[in-house]
């Protein structure tokens, strides 16, 4: 599958097996995949600082978590998966001076893991489901080792 820009429409065109998917299917796909969370939805997230030398191991664990999330969760209603409104991970080198990147980095990487769930009940199901992930103890080990700032059962308070 390839993804090409459609500047005339403001969204990509998806080619599947070299055949163009009908515009109505594309529109439906984008409506389903767009960020569908709102103020009041339940959130979980954490931000942590990791030494550069340890980032590769953290990258691998987070990639495993993301794969588990893809296997067990979906941003659209999908049979056999927990409907989760949003999941993403961001990563950046920590700057010595965020107003002047030319001053270099601290030798730390900042990771942010963000999830948005429909409500507290769905978040609870996510926590329960997480117990079945074979690397959950390693994941919790991140909390012990890096002392992240954590938002547990937070609420979306603003969005575009």
Give short role names for the model-derived ranges.
Residues 6, 10-112, 116-129, 145-160:
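Short S/T/G/P-rich N-terminal loop/turn motif that feeds into the first structured element of a domain
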Residues 108, 134-136:
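N-terminal soluble domains immediately following signal/targeting peptides that reside
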Residues 141-142:
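Loop-helix junctions at membrane interfaces
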């Amino acid at each position: 599958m390839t993804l090409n820009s459609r500047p005339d429409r403001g969204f990509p065109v998806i080619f599947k097996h070299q055949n163009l998917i009908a515009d109505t299917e594309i529109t439906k796909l984008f409506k389903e995949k767009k960020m569908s969370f709102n103020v009041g939805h339940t959130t979980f997230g954490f931000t942590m600082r990791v030494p550069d030398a340890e980032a590769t191991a953290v990258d691998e664990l987070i990639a495993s978590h993301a794969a588990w999330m893809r296997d067990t969760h979906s941003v659209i209603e999908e049979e056999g998966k927990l409907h989760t409104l949003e999941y993403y991970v961001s990563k950046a080198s920590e700057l010595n001076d965020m107003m002047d990147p030319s001053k270099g980095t601290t030798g730390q990487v900042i990771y942010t893991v963000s999830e948005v769930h429909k409500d507290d009940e769905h978040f609870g199901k996510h926590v329960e489901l997480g117990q079945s992930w074979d690397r959950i103890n390693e994941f919790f080990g991140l909390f012990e080792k890096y002392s992240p700032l954590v938002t547990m059962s937070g609420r979306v308070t603003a969005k575009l």
